[in-house]
């Protein structure tokens, strides 16, 4: 019966050895995969994540700086636009004042032209009156001469005839002097009035010319300011459109970056979960391996002819640490025999036994 038990134990031992070899091979593969995941993937993903995060922050900072610069330019353009509007209002007020002055000058010119026409009419009337008086004077002189000729009497040769011719000449000279004086006074008055009107017309014409020049200058300035205002309005609209486009693009890019960050975080979480799953599998395999090591050691003692019967209880394996890339597991099984207690402690790291100790205590009956 003991031989059958040993044979059965040998068969079980052989199957356990095959299973242990298979598990050791799987353990090595899992350890290599774990080292790869622990040493390379997390750092690479972390570096990629940090690099993308830094790039996104740089882009966000650049967009914020561009936005602030565009806002400053927009404020400056708004200030320039307000200044130009103020200047435009002032120029419009000056133009209105110039137009009012021009209308006043036009009224003065019209009044001066009307006065000139009236004076010319008076001069024509005076010249007509002078011509009429001259004709009347000549007619009166002719009638007087005819009367004097008709009233002449013949006297004797020794009697001297009255000096009528001299009197007529004196009268004619007096009338001619009066007519000449009146003509000269009229001509002088006409010349003075004409000169005054000419000076007034010249002054009004000069003022009108200056007013026209000022009006043209104001008109050119208004046109230039209007063109500048339209240009600034176009620039302001263009900058506002660019600002809206940049804000929309910034919002879209920010949303894309947030999606990318969320996706990377999800991938990192998935990798962490997968790593935890592999670590759990590795822990389970280590537990199985330790149990098999204990059972193999027990069978080895049986094969060496140990006479006592060993009952190995089910062990609990805890306190596995993977944070510092090291695994510290202590197993303290208790082997109950009839007369003694064997306690074996095995400590492993990365799948290799680094410390093993066995103690034996006598069991009191």
From Swiss-Prot:
Keywords: Coiled coil, Intermediate filament. Residues 186-189 are annotated as: Linker 2. Residues 311-365 are annotated as: Tail. GO terms for molecular function: structural constituent of cytoskeleton. Residues 148-163 are annotated as: Linker 12. Residues 38-48 are annotated as: Linker 1. Residues 2-310 form the IF rod domain. Residues 164-185 are annotated as: Coil 2A. Residues 1-5 are annotated as: Head. Signal peptide: none annotated. One of its GO terms (biological process) is intermediate filament organization. Pfam families: Filament. GO terms for cellular component: cell projection; cytoplasm; intermediate filament. Residues 6-37 are annotated as: Coil 1A. It comes from the Eukaryota. Residues 49-147 are annotated as: Coil 1B. InterPro entries: IF_conserved, IF_rod_dom, Intermediate_filament, Keratin_I. Residues 190-310 are annotated as: Coil 2B. PANTHER family: GLIAL FIBRILLARY ACIDIC PROTEIN. Belongs to the intermediate filament family. This is Glial fibrillary acidic protein.
């Amino acid at each position: 019966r003991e031989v059958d038990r040993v044979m059965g134990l040998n068969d079980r031992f052989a199957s356990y050895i095959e299973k242990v070899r298979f598990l050791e091979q799987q353990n090595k593969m899992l350890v290599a995969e774990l080292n790869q995941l622990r040493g390379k993937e997390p750092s690479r993903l972390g570096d990629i994540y940090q690099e993308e995060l830094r790039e996104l922050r740089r882009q966000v900072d650049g967009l914020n700086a561009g936005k602030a610069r565009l806002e400053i330019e927009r404020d400056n353009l708004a200030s320039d636009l307000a200044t130009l509007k103020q200047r435009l209002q002032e120029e419009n007020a000056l133009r209105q004042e110039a137009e009012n002055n021009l209308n006043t000058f036009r009224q003065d010119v019209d009044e001066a032209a009307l006065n000139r026409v009236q004076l010319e009419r008076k001069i024509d009337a005076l010249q007509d009156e002078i011509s009429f008086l001259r004709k009347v004077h000549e007619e009166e002189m002719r009638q007087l001469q005819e009367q004097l000729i008709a009233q002449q009497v013949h006297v004797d040769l020794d009697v001297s005839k009255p000096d009528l011719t001299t009197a007529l000449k004196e009268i004619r000279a007096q009338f001619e002097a009066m007519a000449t004086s009146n003509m000269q006074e009229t001509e002088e008055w006409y010349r003075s009035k004409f000169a005054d009107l000419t000076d007034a017309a010249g002054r009004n014409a000069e003022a009108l010319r200056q007013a026209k020049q000022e009006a043209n200058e104001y008109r050119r300035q208004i046109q230039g300011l209007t063109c500048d205002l339209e240009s600034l309005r176009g620039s302001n609209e263009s900058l506002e459109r660019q600002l809206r486009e940049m804000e929309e693009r910034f919002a879209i890019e920010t949303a894309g970056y947030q999606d990318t960050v969320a996706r990377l975080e999800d991938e990192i979480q998935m990798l962490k979960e997968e790593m935890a799953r592999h670590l759990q599998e590795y822990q389970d395999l280590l537990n199985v391996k330790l149990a098999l090591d204990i059972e193999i050691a027990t069978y080895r003692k049986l094969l060496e002819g140990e006479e006592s019967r060993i009952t190995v209880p089910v062990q609990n394996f805890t306190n596995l640490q993977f944070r510092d890339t090291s695994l510290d597991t202590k197993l303290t099984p208790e082997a109950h025999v009839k007369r003694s207690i064997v306690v074996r402690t095995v400590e492993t790291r990365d799948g290799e036994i680094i410390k093993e100790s066995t103690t034996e205590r006598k069991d009191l009956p």
